[in-house]
């Protein structure tokens, strides 16, 4: 139900206008990372969470776009129920799972939810979180973009793990999980895998740090940005394929580019 109150319309128009300035019509899929602290403080005083999330997403859905949002649960054991297990991430991540026409991928650690005409892209994925037949791989060549709303680029970019797996980063290793995956009570399988940090190298925790890569990225023409990541007021759009290629190139130039500390294997 759309509330015709002024606060909702104001927020809706705020985001719609920003999206238009970012040329969202060049894209069909929007992979969204979000932190609403700044935006909510300015726009959501009298809005419910539902109304605010609608104001963010509806302008895209009404342009026939598909939005994809991480709904990670990190279910490393026991049962992951695709249709029920809540996400351990933030506001938009929880909100999207409550929507009537949502589709959700099946990975017990790293699932994604989608709304819009292409939402089924996230369904029936392979068992690898970031690798073959994953949401990340499927978005390649699909007129996709990554949209950071109130989140600096260097703080969130799971796409780098897809790149690390693609390029054979030696500081990560593939790990399988015995979590049993169900959807609406139907058993789908187990042994879903993720390419995770190694824990066996003394003096290295392999924490990822995207500061250096982000600085280089801003020197390219890839990010289009309105607002300022320093106070979380940014809306930043990056072409998904161009961003992926940039990360691949960065990795081959420097195998430690995504790490907080240099690692020589």
Where are these regions (language model features)?
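N-terminal and secondary-structure boundary signal
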Residues: 1-265
């Amino acid at each position: 139900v759309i509330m015709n109150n002024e606060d909702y319309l104001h927020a809706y128009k705020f985001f719609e206008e920003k999206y238009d300035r970012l040329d969202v019509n060049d894209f069909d899929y929007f992979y969204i990372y979000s932190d609403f602290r700044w935006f909510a403080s300015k726009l959501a005083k009298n809005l419910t969470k539902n109304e605010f999330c609608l104001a963010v997403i509806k302008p895209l859905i009404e342009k026939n776009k598909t939005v994809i949002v991480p709904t990670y649960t990190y279910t490393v054991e026991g049962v992951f129920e695709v249709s029920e297990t809540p996400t351990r991430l933030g506001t938009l991540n929880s909100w999207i799972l409550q929507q009537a026409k949502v589709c959700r991928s099946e990975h017990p650690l790293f699932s994604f939810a989608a709304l819009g005409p292409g939402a089924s892209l996230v369904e029936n994925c392979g068992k690898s979180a970031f690798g073959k037949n994953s949401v990340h791989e499927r978005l390649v060549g699909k007129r996709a973009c990554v949209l950071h709303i109130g989140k600096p680029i260097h703080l969130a970019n799971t796409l780098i793990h897809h790149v690390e797996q693609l390029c054979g980063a030696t500081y990560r290793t593939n790990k399988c999980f015995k979590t049993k995956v169900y959807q609406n009570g139907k058993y789908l399988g187990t042994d879903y895998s993720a390419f995770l940090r190694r824990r066996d190298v003394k003096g290295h925790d392999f924490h990822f740090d995207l500061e250096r890569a982000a600085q280089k990225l801003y020197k390219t023409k890839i990010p289009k940005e309105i607002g300022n990541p320093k106070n979380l007021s940014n809306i930043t759009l990056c072409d998904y394929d161009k961003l992926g290629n940039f990360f691949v190139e960065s990795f081959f130039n420097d195998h430690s580019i995504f790490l907080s500390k240099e690692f020589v294997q």
